[in-house]
A protein has these predicted regions:
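An N-terminally biased module of ancient metal coordination in phosphate/nucleic-acid-related enzymes
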Residues: 1-78, 83-86, 142, 161, ...
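Conserved beta-strand positions in the central sheet of alpha/beta enzyme cores
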Residues: 37-38, 128-129, 148
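Charged catalytic cores and adjacent phosphate/nucleic-acid-binding surfaces used
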Residues: 1-6, 10, 14, 20-26, ...
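Active-site-proximal loop/helix segments of hydrolase catalytic cores
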Residues: 18, 109, 123, 128-139
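Surface-exposed amphipathic alpha-helices with a cationic face
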Residues: 3, 29, 66-70, 112-126, ...
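Short, flexible loop segments at the rims of nucleotide/cofactor-binding pockets, characterized by
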Residues: 12-16, 54-55, 103-108, 125-128, ...
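Binuclear metal-dependent hydrolase catalytic cores centered on His/Asp/Glu-rich metal-binding motifs
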Residues: 90-124
């Protein structure tokens, strides 16, 4: 098995990130992880220039990170973190959209919550409510496929107990990631997945069939900033 951090960002797209792709890859390699899912922000406030040009850059940033990871022995899978205009306190990580879905698809942040879920499911993707207890409350769990234990050390707690209760109530999948932006130390956390997984499609099929993979959850920070 290998540890996969299912939530991280690079500065090339996520404007709140301080870490470029090469540094991100090097950090995860040094930490000993086998894989990551790059989930850069897909949010109206992060778009620079024309939308169609921006989504191409979004995909290019992933390809850059994937290529850098390949050279270092780190597998990099493709994900998206969408913040809908209608509910900007809520973020959703989507696993299973293709690069073509992102480049040719609608402006995902402009979709309603229901329409975003429908779009993800129409592409056979899985949609997770990221950090559902961070400055917000969980959405309707019947609409989504999973939720996340988020170990970003900027916040007081990963809310593991509450997230698990939410997941149990609706039979949701669970993921885990550090939400690393380079603004704090990198929490050691993630999901244990087979080393044989090589592609994003294989990763998505694994979490589709294994709703509750073993998680590595970082302890809550002793001195959070918030």
């Amino acid at each position: 098995m290998m540890l996969c951090d299912a939530h991280c960002h690079t500065a090339g797209i996520s404007l709140c990130s301080r870490v470029p792709a090469d540094q991100l890859v090097e950090l995860f390699v040094q930490e000993g992880l086998g894989a990551i899912v790059l989930t850069n922000h897909y949010k109206r406030a992060h778009v620079r220039g024309e939308f169609r040009d921006w989504v191409k850059r979004y995909v290019d940033e992933y390809e850059l990170t994937r290529a850098l990871g390949e050279k270092k022995g780190l597998k990099v899978f493709f994900g998206v973190e969408v913040t809908p205009d209608e509910m900007t306190q809520n973020d959703f990580t989507i696993y299973g959209l293709t690069k073509e879905d992102v480049v040719n698809g609608p402006e995902l942040y402009a979709l309603s919550f229901d329409a975003l879920c429908d779009f993800a499911h129409s592409r056979n993707a899985l949609i997770y409510h990221a950090h559902p207890f961070r400055r917000t409350t969980p959405v309707d769990g019947t609409k989504i496929d999973g939720t996340e234990i988020n170990c970003h050390p900027l916040y007081k707690t990963c809310a593991e107990k509450e997230v698990r209760a939410f997941a149990d109530k609706y039979g949701l999948r669970l993921s885990c990631g550090a939400d690393y932006h380079g603004d704090t130390y990198k929490a050691h956390c993630g999901m244990w997945i087979p080393k044989s997984i090589e592609t994003t499609a294989q990763f998505v099929e694994y979490i589709r069939e294994n709703k509750r993979p073993e998680l590595c959850i970082a302890p809550d920070p002793v001195d959070p900033i918030e």
